[in-house]
């Protein structure tokens, strides 16, 4: 039996609190950057970030964050109900 929702079951303004959590590590960022062939120093070079950025440390790749949030949402929103990903609008970093 499906645990998620079909598109026509969603209502504008629905809010979901997802029970899954995960600590994101520096190694996650390094692995994701390497897997996606992204050499951006902003994500992988601690020395560069300490000298040249206002944050002083590497930033997590925003596409990793988006993918993680989608993954965390699957079990209670779309598990076994997704037919296709129809796209995303208004995604902001």
PLM region spans:
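Hot-dog-fold acyl-thioester-processing enzymes
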Residues: 2-87
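Beta-rich strand-turn-strand
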Residues: 92-93
């Amino acid at each position: 039996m499906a645990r998620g929702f079909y598109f026509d079951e969603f209502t504008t303004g629905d809010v979901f609190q997802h029970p899954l959590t995960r600590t994101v590590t520096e190694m996650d960022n390094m692995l994701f950057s390497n897997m996606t062939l992204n050499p951006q120093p902003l994500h992988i070079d601690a020395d560069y970030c300490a000298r040249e950025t206002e944050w002083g440390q590497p930033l997590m790749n925003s596409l990793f964050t988006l993918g993680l949030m989608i993954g965390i949402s699957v079990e209670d929103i779309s598990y076994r109900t997704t037919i296709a990903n129809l796209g995303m609008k208004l995604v902001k970093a």
